Amino acid sequence: MMHPDTELRYINDEIGYGVFATKFIPKGTIVWAQDNLDQVLDPVFVERLDSLRKQDVQKYSFKNQFGKYILCWDKARYVNHSFHANCVPTMYDLELAARDVLPGEELTDDYGTLNLDEPFDCLPESDTDRSRVMPDDLLRYYPQWDRIAAEAFQRFNHVEQPLLHLISPKHLETIRGITEQRLAIDSVIHLYCRSQWQTRQQWKT
């Protein structure tokens, strides 16, 4: 579920819709948490879908570390990509605000964290040499995302957390240890799931 202080807005014909903050969301706030309304789909099931449904599942879902497709039930499926994302993933089925998000600002993810099935060509952005999201970006950029997440967790206990009740019980003690600085975060490199595209590339070489 997305943070309640967000809304869906139309951007333009090229991008489509995006998710925007309606109020100030401070750094360290849970901006998304996986909950029991999200669909968890087996890749074999997705592969057997008709082409129309399969196309939409692959467009609006992401893959977890177990290769399962996570299809969010709410506006979370419309979060767009940025190489300077203001949301950062964790190993705990939630994302945090990587920095303060201002009212009217779009919430974004770096799609490199989402285990894409295929490379994803992006709109140009300043201050980055990246122009394409690759299925194995987690293997390249995990230290950067770990650092951002660790810094965000330092603010976790100092901000309001409307989605706190959605944290999975299996993660509660670990998150408590992180926020109390007794534990280090688990690296998001463990979110990585090898894609069929990468397997095909390996066979080509």
Question: Whereabouts are the PLM-identified features?
Answer:
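Catalytic core of the SET domain in histone-lysine N-methyltransferases
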Residues: 1-12, 51-124, 129
